[in-house]
Amino acid sequence: MTIHGFTCIEGHTEGMPVRMVIDGAPTLQGATMNARREDFVAHHDWVRRTLMLEPRGHAHMSGTIFYPPVSDNADFSLLFIETSGCLPMCGHATIGSIAFAIEERLVVPKRPGTVTVDVPAGQIVARYQTDGERVTSVRFTNVPSFLLKRDVEIAIPALGTLAVDIAYGGNFYPIVEVQPNFPGCEHFTPDELLAWGRDVQRAVGDALEVVHPDNPAIRGVRHCMWTGKPIADDAHGRAVVIAGDSLVDRSPCGTGSSARVAQRFARGWLKEGEAYCHESLIGSRFIGRVESTVRLESGVDAVLSSIEGRAWVTGRAQYRVDPSQPYALGFSLQEFVN
């Protein structure tokens, strides 16, 4: 491997970092973004490690790779990368990447005010608002989301027995609602929730096989959502989302918000069209809604949800990858813990 360079746009969505690669990314094989994701995982995961992990990234880094559209009707494509892996979908990164692409003039949408984006989980349509050259909000309609399992009983050492709902919003989420052994996320530290989130992921994986009913390539649990009382009086819920071994989402989590909207709708706690203000650990917020109901090819009932949020560009960066340097392809502290 020779010295390689990447150009990235840096920013954040409601407090959660988004690093969007706009130059230097590998050419991927496949007719769809799902197939190209599989090619990336098999042959190019060093790119993710290099840009997401230390020393160029950190334990909570998240990002995308900007690609030309795969479909004729799309404006561009996105591949989602973060410390935990290459994801089928990431909502906060979608909001950020759409805002960045428009503000930095990487794309001229076919329909002003609307963009269509190819992603591994499918195709999403987003509407955006502007004030001059600034994108002030992005509202995207996510892939079909659904409640896969309810009241799955698991046990973790710190809290004992828990009942979790498993919902899909582009990724699978065990959702831990307030219950006897869990009084709410506001009662615990982020470090505690991170450690216990890893335990929940393992416990769910031991309890059952989690597979998308229409797409067996989407499987397994790499997230956990701890819920609790919101900070603001006008918010409806709060969540601390854990991804993989080390990431604590600073935003309310886009795919997690879609999963929670789908869960609440399936349980009768949310009506179609009703706004759900979802707070994060730091009090930032997304607005989620059930836009319509759909049925998957497998016959599973699902919803099309929209998630609305804001993002900001903080700069541009050039990254140099020299294989002769130590830790050139990134490292995680977790790799050095027995």
UniProtKB/Swiss-Prot annotation:
This is 4-hydroxyproline 2-epimerase 2. SUPFAM superfamilies: Diaminopimelate epimerase-like (SSF54506). It catalyses: trans-4-hydroxy-L-proline = cis-4-hydroxy-D-proline. Keywords: Isomerase. Belongs to the proline racemase family. The active site is at C90 (proton acceptor), C253 (proton donor). GO terms for molecular function: 4-hydroxyproline epimerase activity. It is an enzyme of class 5 (isomerase). Its EC number is 5.1.1.8. Substrate binds at G91, H92, H223, D249, G254, T255. Pfam families: Pro_racemase.
